[in-house]
Amino acid sequence: MVMLKISSFLAVYALVVCQMDSFQAAPVRPGLESITDRVTLSDYEARRLLNALVKDFIQMTAEELEQASEGNSLDRPISKRCASLSTCVLGKLSQELHKLQTYPRTDVGAGTPGKKRNVLNDLDHERYANYGETLGNN
């Protein structure tokens, strides 16, 4: 992108240098006279070239502005808009917390619904399981 801008400015500069000879202006440097003698453009060609360069430059700047406006949209996550500011870090943490709260639950792990075993109750139940049988036999 930068190379296109530089090349367009160089082309405009070359156009101006070529036109300096046609307007009988003094050259910037004496060494440029031989270059301007070899390269001559008619007024029509020079205007067309200048119009094309201006249109390209306007189109490039419009595309850059469009990309910049897309880059600052609210649809992008906060983490991509800024990285190290404290408000951005807090925003990123709140996004992660929200993701964890809205994330669908799975049926594995310690806090899942279903049959829960209590080890102490199981030991007491096994200890007194035969108590009723011994009373019935006496």
Swiss-Prot record:
Alphabetized InterPro entries for the sequence: Calcitonin (IPR021118), Calcitonin-like (IPR021117), Calcitonin/adrenomedullin (IPR021116), Calcitonin_CS (IPR018360), Calcitonin_peptide-like (IPR001693)
One MF annotation (Gene Ontology) recorded for this entry: hormone activity
Superkingdom in the source lineage: Eukaryota
Keywords of this entry: Amidation, Cleavage on pair of basic residues, Disulfide bond, Hormone, Secreted, Signal
Disulfide bonds: 82-88
Keyword Secreted attributed: yes
Coiled-coil annotated residue ranges, if any: none
Location of this chain's protein in the cell: Secreted
SMART domains, per the entry: CALCITONIN
Propiece residue ranges: 26-79, 118-138
Function statement: Causes a rapid but short-lived drop in the level of calcium and phosphate in blood by promoting the incorporation of those ions in the bones.
Family: Belongs to the calcitonin family.
Protein name: Calcitonin
Organism listed in the record: Gallus gallus
Name of the gene encoding the protein in the UniProt record: CALCA
